[in-house]
Structures are given as C-alpha cells and as structure tokens.
UniProtKB/Swiss-Prot annotation:
SUPFAM superfamilies named among the record's database cross-references: YbjQ-like
Signal sequence residues: none
Annotated protein name in UniProt: UPF0145 protein lpp0255
Assigned protein family: Belongs to the UPF0145 family.
Highest taxon in the source lineage: Bacteria
The organism of origin for this protein: Legionella pneumophila (strain Paris)
Transmembrane spans: none
Length: 105
C-alpha cells in the first residue's frame, strides 16, 4: 500500500475519511569516536561537519521509516502534518523524532 505523506493538513483533491491519531518514529544516536574527534576538530577551525551531517540524515530517515511503520500498523494510508523534532539526550546523544497524524483517505 502506498503511504501518502504531507507536511500540510490535507491532500489536494482527497477527502480524509478518518483520523487515526498521532504516529511517530523515534531514534537516538550518538557519534562514533572518530566522528566525535573529527567534529571536535571542525568545531575549532570551522566548516561543515560531514560525519555529523551524515549521522543526522541517517537518523532522520530511520525515524521517518519508523513513523510509516507505526501508521501502517493502524491501517492508515496517509500521514498529514508530518514534522521532525530533535533534542539532546545527555551529553553525547541526539534524539530525532518524526511525527504526524495518521489518516485514512
């Protein structure tokens, strides 16, 4: 089944038949030792921290997929108002949350 996903509150030309509630995917990641060392050096001299960017992108993708799986478990075929949020966990971890409202179209 194809999952339609939007950051908006509706799908153009579609009628939302039922709202099933909030769905989410949560991932907590921390950098490897080498990523931490490279990130520390980059923070001193400035510039893009590629290892951190890659880690964050993977965490976002994993959280996104977990949100879709949560919606599929509810037999949803759409997710509206999809958002990402992040936060720090302790001194070394980053939480990535992907959430939205599962719907039947």
């Amino acid at each position: 089944m194809t999952m339609m996903i939007t950051t908006g509150n509706s799908f153009d030309g579609k009628v939302i038949k039922q709202c099933l509630g909030i769905v989410r995917g949560i991932v907590v990641r921390s950098p490897t030792i080498s990523q931490g060392l490279m990130g520390g050096l980059k923070s001193i001299v400035g510039g893009k921290i590629g290892a951190y960017s890659q880690m964050c992108e993977h965490a976002r993708e994993e959280a996104f997929q977990l949100m879709i799986e949560h919606a599929q478990a509810l037999n949803a075929n759409g997710i509206i108002a999809m958002r990402y949020d992040t936060g720090e966990i302790g001194q070394a971890g980053t939480e990535v949350l992907c959430y939205g409202t599962a719907v039947i179209i």
